[in-house]
Amino acid sequence: MIKTVNISILAVLVIALGASSCKKEDEESGETGGCMDVNSPHYSSSATYDNGTCEFLYVTDYELTSYEDIDWDLLINVDADVYIKVKRQSSSSWEFSSNTIDNADPNTVQIWSAPNQFQLLNETYVWELFDADNPPIDEDDAMASGSFNPVASGNNGVVVSESSDGLTIVKIHYSLH
């Protein structure tokens, strides 16, 4: 019994000594561990080596929280048939283009699931909200647009982006891995 206790105490001391010596080596060498990838919300500009703490944002859902309540179609008292597109500002192609939600109630949150959970980078993204003309009589109406940087403005799994006129709010939900 005493031998088992002594071995346990010795094991704890060896582990503690090993852990403290690693920390001491880092402090003595002047190296700072951290995430060195600017596309991670855990990025540290003072890190001198990557210690494996990087995580990245992957989009899960797009949410239209509010938008201007006006008649977008030729018929009176018809709610908008909404769809949204999202892309990196520097890109010519859309990374997400939603299906159309017909007669969307402006007082109800509209949600689109991301068909593929692509990584959101530390760049400016733009979104555009449209009213689809059903049946297609003329071009779809541009309702609102906005921009966001998910790494800079993401908080607790959500990026909130407001249109330039402040009447439309889009939320991009993400998970970290």
Stretch-by-stretch model annotation:
Residues 15-44, 48-58:
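Bacterial Sec-dependent N-terminal signal peptides
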Residues 84, 111-147:
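Eukaryotic beta-sheet cores, primarily in C2 and C2-like/PH beta-sandwich modules
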Residues 57-76:
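Short amphipathic, basic-aromatic surface patches that mediate peripheral association
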